[in-house]
Amino acid sequence: MDASANNHGKLNPVSFSFIRFYILAFLFFAANSALTIILPLRSEAAGLSQAEIGLMMGAYMFTCMLLRPLAAQLLGKHGPLRVMQWLLLLHAVTLVLFMMGDVEAYLWLRALQGVATAFFSMTMQAGIVEKLEDKDRAQGLSMYTLFTMVPSLIIPILAIQIWESSREIWFTVLMIGLAALPLLIGYRVDQPRRTVQNQSYTLRDMFRSFRAIWRSTPLLISSAVMLFASCVFGATATFLPLYMVSTGHASAGVFLTIQGLVVILCRFVLRKKIPSDGSWNTWLIAGLLLCAALGTQMLALLEFIGPLVYLSAVFSGFALALMYPTLTTYLSFVLPADSRYVLMGMFMSSYDLGFSLGGLAMGLIVQNSSYSTMFTICTLLSVVAMMLVVIFRKRMESGNGERLSTAN
């Protein structure tokens, strides 16, 4: 057992075991960061249309969304350690197939990559919930999500260099490295063999849990907020570079760098500030949604505000950094233990669905209007989510006192 484990077998979020967790998360998501750059370039060079490229890239998130609840079901049946071993093997095989296959196979391989990601994120977050003290849970989830974001700052630069070099050997080396290293680090990672659920969770039980979303105000409101927010995040990630190139008023590279740095700094510096007692903080969530709204509205006004648009990166980065770990930590406390991971899987699916819709639905809006109109609609989505949070304030905060007394 890790030397930093306490008498109850719980670990410290900065212990050696959890540093391995975070490194594993970085390596796993580095593969997607690389493929997100290289696959569209390869596909376009091979003659695929923009619609075909969009379908191929969207297959990743869509498969993720569909399989998260199933991943949670298998966690309860087989335990995080066994599921982790299976998914790392699947991940490695998928990357090797990317190396060997041509563009016609990319759609199915992206879907297969989405399968591995659905299981990976559920398994990692189950491990954090099971292995950390309640008071450290928010810090652990924040650090985990931080390390899933870092590859998006570093790996794309490497991927572009590989593409521009036109040497297939470097792509092969990258894929082999990103297939082998997670296996070496993660195959024996310190994951629990069983979860609190610790039971075989049948499909009937899983569909019964789906109905619970309408009966559980915390799950319903959290999922709705995440759906709206991730739609905004997805639209920004998909269309911001095209928007800035088309207007010529700002640099997408500078904007994304500022946003990425804000995300990393917030998730590290503020990791201990995220509520880790199961309490709902209405004004924190509303404030994050306000930041998201300000960020997209400044983008909508890009042609009028010029360089001031980089403030949008700060607002958007702040919302992006704290929204997901805050809501995930809250739900990990309030959901029933016997179906916690299936219900959390449904919540995470709302993120995947929103992100996908941000590219698909907002793309249709751009085609029929303008980028400015699309970002204004994103602002309205954030405002609607903020109104939901305020309207349901009393119901969401009704259990705060009881959970705080239990925590103390």
Where are these regions (language model features)?
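Helix-loop boundary and gating motifs at the non-cytosolic
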Residues: 12-56, 218-225, 230-243, 255
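Juxtamembrane intracellular "pre-TM" segments in multi-pass secondary transporters
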Residues: 2-15, 190-222
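Helix-to-loop junctions at the C-terminal end of transmembrane segments
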Residues: 67-79, 163, 266-280
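Central cavity-lining transmembrane alpha-helices of secondary-active solute carriers
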Residues: 58-71, 257-269
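Structural signature of the two symmetry-related core transmembrane helices
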Residues: 82-96, 283-297
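Symmetry-related core transmembrane helices of the 12-TM Major Facilitator Superfamily/SLC fold
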Residues: 171-186, 375-391
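Paired small-residue
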Residues: 104-113, 307-315
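Cytoplasmic helix-loop-helix junction between adjacent transmembrane helices
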Residues: 111-147
